[in-house]
């Protein structure tokens, strides 16, 4: 019974805090809350603004190459393993696939900003 009492107290306290956190910011709307935050976007307007596909492609390319660096960074420590041929083949395949993806995006003019 003691465990049930503690559970009920925790649930009640959590619900009270969630309710207070939800209603408290809506009580005092002053100009600082309504002004644009560091990014310059109006916080009271719709968040569904049109997004440039060029920026999206550059962001995806950045993420892919960032992932490549994260995967290739442990290679110096992997050199100490016994089966170095498999490790080198895997890293070569990874770099080749990413280079082919970059070449494809370049050929499709996904990196051109003049269009």
Curated annotation (Swiss-Prot):
Its recorded name reads NADH-ubiquinone oxidoreductase chain 3
Native source species: Isthmomys pirrensis
Explain the purpose of this protein: Core subunit of the mitochondrial membrane respiratory chain NADH dehydrogenase (Complex I) which catalyzes electron transfer from NADH through the respiratory chain, using ubiquinone as an electron acceptor. Essential for the catalytic activity of complex I.
GO MF terms listed in the record are: NADH dehydrogenase (ubiquinone) activity
The encoding gene: MT-ND3
Chief site of localization: mitochondrion
Q: Which PANTHER family match?
A: NADH-UBIQUINONE OXIDOREDUCTASE CHAIN 3 (PTHR11058:SF9)
List the membrane topology term(s).
Multi-pass membrane protein
NAD among the record's keywords? yes
Q: Where in the cell is it found?
A: Mitochondrion inner membrane
* Known catalytic reactions: a ubiquinone + NADH + 5 H(+)(in) = a ubiquinol + NAD(+) + 4 H(+)(out)
The protein's matches in Pfam families, at most eight in alphabetical order, are given as:
Oxidored_q4
What Enzyme Commission number(s) apply to this enzyme?
Answer: 7.1.1.2
- InterPro entries, per database record: NADH_UbQ/plastoQ_OxRdtase_su3, NDAH_ubi_oxred_su3_sf
Taxonomically, which superkingdom?
Eukaryota
């Amino acid at each position: 019974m003691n465990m049930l009492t503690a559970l009920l107290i925790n649930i009640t306290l959590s619900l009270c805090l969630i309710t207070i956190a939800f209603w408290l910011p809506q009580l005092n709307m002053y100009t600082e809350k309504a002004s644009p935050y560091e990014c310059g976007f109006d916080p009271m307007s719709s968040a569904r603004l049109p997004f440039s596909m060029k920026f999206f492609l550059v962001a995806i390319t950045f993420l892919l190459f960032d992932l490549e660096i994260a995967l290739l960074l442990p290679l110096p420590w992997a050199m100490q393993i016994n089966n170095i041929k498999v490790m080198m083949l895997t890293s070569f395949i990874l770099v080749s696939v990413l280079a082919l993806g970059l070449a494809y995006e370049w050929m499709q003019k996904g990196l051109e900003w003049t269009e």
